[in-house]
Curated annotation (Swiss-Prot):
Gene3D superfamilies: Archease domain (3.55.10.10). It comes from Methanothermobacter thermautotrophicus (strain ATCC 29096 / DSM 1053 / JCM 10044 / NBRC 100330 / Delta H). Activates the tRNA-splicing ligase complex by facilitating the enzymatic turnover of catalytic subunit RtcB. Acts by promoting the guanylylation of RtcB, a key intermediate step in tRNA ligation. Can also alter the NTP specificity of RtcB such that ATP, dGTP or ITP is used efficiently. May also act as a chaperone or modulator of proteins involved in DNA or RNA processing. Ca(2+) binds at D12, D139, L140. This is Protein archease.
Length: 140
């Protein structure tokens, strides 16, 4: 099973992220978002950032997860290449505890597209044939 695949969207970047469970989908979605920006295979997992989010549903949680990672990238000038996510149901919604691993942007990192924002446009999470997949469109 591939972790993610890109699809054509005019002036934006779109991808499907796949996983056997919701956590794996969220990890692969984060990896795909950073793959839009750089070759993540060349980004060392030298530093960690911890993220905690509570949202009312799966789609909102995915949006909030990616949006928080993009905020950290934009404010700390860091690229991520590895992710670990744990999702639990709580009384107030779904709670995500995640770790993103990467390093500060260096001259040697390939510069691809700049992601301006995560969008809700066409975002969905589907359960199909024992797998879960999520569609995400990023504003470039």
């Amino acid at each position: 099973m591939k972790g993610f695949e890109f699809f054509d969207v005019t002036a934006d970047a779109g991808f499907w992220a796949y996983g056997h469970d919701l956590e794996e989908v969220f990890e692969n979605a984060a990896l795909a978002m950073f793959e839009v920006m750089t070759d993540t295979s060349l980004v060392e997992a030298a530093e960690e950032r911890r993220v905690e989010i509570t949202s009312e549903d799966r789609v909102s949680l995915l949006y909030d997860w990616l949006d928080e990672l993009l905020f950290i990238h934009d404010t700390e000038f860091i690229l991520f290449s590895k992710f670990k996510v744990k999702i639990d149901e709580k009384d107030d919604g779904l709670h995500l505890t995640g770790t993103a691993m990467g390093e500060e942007i260096k001259e040697g990192h390939e510069r691809r597209d700049e992601v301006k924002a995560v969008t809700f446009h066409m975002m969905e999470i589907l359960d199909e044939d024992g797998l879960i997949k999520a569609r995400v469109i990023l504003d470039l």
